[in-house]
Amino acid sequence: MICAVYKSLRKADSYLFVEKRNEFERVPEALMAMFGEPQLVMMLPIDKRDHLGFADIKKVKAELKDKGFYLQLPPPVVNLLEQHKKDIGFNPE
């Protein structure tokens, strides 16, 4: 299977994988509205891949088969200062 990968111009580091190029019929309208105008990044031969950057390849393949799309969102931003305070047991109260 070769899937199409699109990036969002509205949401940084957000990618939408669909089964075929320019076929968004199975993607919910609300998601497309939030995602904005999709910009094609690449056509990806997903069957020949063992892994992807940030996404679980098995989950991507399963969701493409079941839902017709997979949405990859960026990992949550970690506040390093707050994490450090927590690690050292700092409590301002």
UniProtKB/Swiss-Prot annotation:
Gene3D superfamilies the record matches: YcgL domain
Domain annotation YcgL: ranges? 1-85
Top-level taxon: Bacteria
Protein name per its UniProtKB record = YcgL domain-containing protein swp_2294
